[in-house]
């Protein structure tokens, strides 16, 4: 069995175990409301919990210019109706529209970008503090594996 299939089976099993405590679902944001839920979670984790000092356009929202170009993978708790985990994904075609990758604002990616093939940048990863038992990150990995 190929590695990707084994990983998918593993993460599906992890998701079933996670469901015994919480009703969790992995999905992509499909509305502005979903994006805001991801941005609120990022604010809670990065700014409130970790003390990051980032420019805020809105109170309680962690966002930047790349958000509207990206896909946002969410783990949603169906019982509490909130995002409890998220990834921000920027494909190569989205990066062209965004004027580059977020990582290019921090690092020189000249050599990386010269490598043939397609690239995907994954960032702004976070998990709600009450859900850090492995289930949410497993669901995020499963969703990312399916996306790839």
List where the protein language model places each region.
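Amphipathic repeat-derived elements
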Residues: 1-8, 41-61, 120-141
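Short acidic N-proximal helix/loop "leader" segments that mark the beginning
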Residues: 1-21
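Short amphipathic alpha-helical surface micro-motifs
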Residues: 5-11, 53-57, 70-72, 100-109, ...
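A generic structural micro-environment signature
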Residues: 7, 32-35, 52, 72, ...
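Short amphipathic alpha-helix that is part of the acyltransferase structural core
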Residues: 14-84, 88-91
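Acyl-donor binding region in acyl/amide transferases
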Residues: 92-148
């Amino acid at each position: 069995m190929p590695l990707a299939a084994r990983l998918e089976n593993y993460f599906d099993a992890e998701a079933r175990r996670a469901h015994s405590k919480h009703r969790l679902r992995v999905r992509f944001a499909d509305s502005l409301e979903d994006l805001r839920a991801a941005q609120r979670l990022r604010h809670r984790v990065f700014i409130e919990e970790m003390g990051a000092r980032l420019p805020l356009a809105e109170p309680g929202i962690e966002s930047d210019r790349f958000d509207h170009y990206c896909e946002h993978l969410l783990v949603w708790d169906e019982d509490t109706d909130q995002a409890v985990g998220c990834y921000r994904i920027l494909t190569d075609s989205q990066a062209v529209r965004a004027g580059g990758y977020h990582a290019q604002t921090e690092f020189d990616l000249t050599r990386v970008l010269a490598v043939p093939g397609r690239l995907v940048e994954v960032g702004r990863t976070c998990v709600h503090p009450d859900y850090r038992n492995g289930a949410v990150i497993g669901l995020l990995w499963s969703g990312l594996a399916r996306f790839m």
